[in-house]
């Protein structure tokens, strides 16, 4: 496999052009996706504590994963010049079992690598980065097959994917900033209650926590409209390049070249 240096600015420009020509509005699809995720988050917040609360939290997390798969599949269709309706968001239900299994297995491997040190955990996360894309493209493959394909596809591209994420970090930080601030305040007050018995406030800035959570979710939705479809489409461009140069998936290439992020491993 020969990897190549990907022209990131060009990929972003091409993604923007593709999204402008999409037959179904990317902003409309993003708004629907983020609104559904926000609704699931609020449902989880209403679930309370105890067994029922845990069950609702797990269920909403799984549903969010299905919606995320559907959004990526929409972006895949955009890159192919195909029409993908709003119902594409729910296409992940057709292979939800494999989707859940893939998340569990990759999370398990990443946790194992993270136990060695922080950096191996990060590298492992990038090693399995394309596994979900392989599964979305071909739901007939097995979970371990998707993971193995991703391991071969990401050889030579982990560092480039890391730089890609850094290039969108400002947008991600902007989208999550209000939620991070609210979470920090809530964590601080809960700690004070546990240690010193000081009751945690039920409101912040004169508003109930649930209302603030809703406001933070709307903020995240609005910011996501500005960058999220482009980010996914650019990530898919990297995936397509990795498939072509690795010969795994579509295309074929010569023998492998390794970079410093790609030491062979026997675990995951």
Tell me what each language-model feature is.
Residues 1-268:
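Hydrophobic alpha-helical membrane segments
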